[in-house]
Amino acid sequence: MATPSSATSLNVENIVFPSSVKPPGDTNTLFLGGAGVRGMEIQGNFVKFTGIGVYLEDKAIPLLAGKWKGKTAEELVNSVEFFRDIVTGPFKKFTQVTMILPLTGKQYSEKVSEMCVGVWKAHGTYTDADGATIDKFLEVFKDENFPPGASILFTTSPDGSLTISFSKDGMIPEAANIVLENEKLAQAVIESVIGKNGVSPATKQSLASRLSDLMNHFDEKATTDAEPNLSKNGL
């Protein structure tokens, strides 16, 4: 039977995403849901900027399987709702963004901030508290530089917090740089990767393929036992 513990590592442009990781400052080990490249077509060439890995708590499988078991990878990758369920699900997500090309913290944080604020204002949900959180987000990245191989690490928790860490040596640090208590930002960071307009279709494809296999081989009884949690959380 396929289980999260049977998840394999992935190599994306010589960036190795291990099969499981323990996020900074956390006691839980998360499994690799999927990984892929982020790039952009520039003057006829596909330029690769980063490799992105998305890790999930083990309980994500029974929680998602209650609704998505039996779906093919193709059905999942084309479902906005499936990825929304990952973003909002009551389980931890860990996103590792590793540089292929160099990037400054200022460039990265300003782009993410502009995207978040734009969406929130369009939806009429932007608040002064959000503005204060964005200021903290920009501050933590301000003096950072990320050469090839360096990583930005995000842990999205069900309690609505976003933990941010940096790695320059390919290792996962034990301690986090900062924890921001803002559920909208926590969800927006991972949604920017795998949401409807996510920046990495390759990561979405990888997630859909691997999670489809894990869910379709998941034990029915465990799935049934987890279903009340899904409905309770409105998924």
Curated annotation (Swiss-Prot):
<dbReference type="InterPro" id="IPR044164">
    <property type="entry name" value="CFI"/>
</dbReference>
<dbReference type="GO" id="GO:0045430">
    <property type="term" value="F:chalcone isomerase activity"/>
</dbReference>
<feature type="site" description="Important for catalytic activity">
    <location>
        <position position="108"/>
    </location>
</feature>
<keyword id="KW-0284">Flavonoid biosynthesis</keyword>
<comment type="function">
    <text>Catalyzes the intramolecular cyclization of bicyclic chalcones into tricyclic (S)-flavanones. Responsible for the isomerization of 4,2',4',6'-tetrahydroxychalcone (also termed chalcone) into naringenin.</text>
</comment>
<comment type="similarity">
    <text>Belongs to the chalcone isomerase family.</text>
</comment>
<dbReference type="InterPro" id="IPR016089">
    <property type="entry name" value="Chalcone_isomerase_bundle_sf"/>
</dbReference>
<dbReference type="Pfam" id="PF02431">
    <property type="entry name" value="Chalcone"/>
</dbReference>
<dbReference type="InterPro" id="IPR016088">
    <property type="entry name" value="Chalcone_isomerase_3-sand"/>
</dbReference>
<dbReference type="GO" id="GO:0009813">
    <property type="term" value="P:flavonoid biosynthetic process"/>
</dbReference>
<comment type="pathway">
    <text>Secondary metabolite biosynthesis; flavonoid biosynthesis.</text>
</comment>
<keyword id="KW-0413">Isomerase</keyword>
<feature type="binding site">
    <location>
        <position position="192"/>
    </location>
    <ligand>
        <name>substrate</name>
    </ligand>
</feature>
<feature type="binding site">
    <location>
        <position position="50"/>
    </location>
    <ligand>
        <name>substrate</name>
    </ligand>
</feature>
<dbReference type="InterPro" id="IPR036298">
    <property type="entry name" value="Chalcone_isomerase_sf"/>
</dbReference>
<protein>
    <recommendedName>
        <fullName>Chalcone--flavanone isomerase 2</fullName>
        <ecNumber>5.5.1.6</ecNumber>
    </recommendedName>
</protein>
<dbReference type="InterPro" id="IPR016087">
    <property type="entry name" value="Chalcone_isomerase"/>
</dbReference>
